[in-house]
């Protein structure tokens, strides 16, 4: 039986509330689960203690039994200091693409050329007056 520690959605429309559960991976997301391990309320502020509550002893028990945490649960465990932080695969996601870099370079070149042109004009007028 492939076990997962994952989120099961509850709450009403536009007001999500999640249970952290240990369940068989073949069961539906909000369906049958084996044990409730905690709760997650995304509507609370990030620094609130009630945002994520987990029974760490039971979570460790299920991890020892071979249950695989989902990505979000593994992030919760990392934030709690229960597991070491892993490298993420999308390190370049925040960097701009090639065309955006080219446009930024062109814009910078035009701005520097425009800044140099007015600076040269008064210098040329001063030289012409002498």
From Swiss-Prot:
Residues 110-130 have a biased composition (Low complexity). Pfam families: Ribosomal_S16. Residues 99-109 have a biased composition (Basic and acidic residues). InterPro entries: Ribosomal_bS16, Ribosomal_bS16_dom_sf. Keywords: Ribonucleoprotein, Ribosomal protein. It comes from the Bacteria. Belongs to the bacterial ribosomal protein bS16 family. This is Small ribosomal subunit protein bS16. It comes from Jannaschia sp. (strain CCS1). The lineage of its organism: Bacteria, Pseudomonadati, Pseudomonadota, Alphaproteobacteria, Rhodobacterales. The gene is rpsP.
């Amino acid at each position: 039986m492939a076990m997962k520690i994952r989120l099961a959605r509850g709450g009403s429309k536009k007001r999500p509330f999640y249970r952290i559960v240990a369940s068989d991976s073949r069961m539906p997301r909000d369906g049958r689960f084996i044990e409730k391990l905690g709760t997650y309320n995304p509507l609370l502020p990030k620094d609130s203690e009630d945002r994520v509550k987990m029974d760490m002893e039971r979570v460790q028990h299920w991890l020892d039994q071979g249950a695989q945490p989902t990505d979000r649960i593994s992030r919760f465990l990392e934030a709690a200091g229960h597991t070491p932080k892993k490298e993420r695969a999308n390190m370049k996601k925040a960097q701009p693409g090639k065309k955006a870099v080219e446009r930024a370079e062109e814009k910078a070149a035009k701005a520097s050329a425009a800044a140099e042109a007015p600076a040269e004009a008064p210098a040329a007028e001063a030289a012409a007056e002498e």
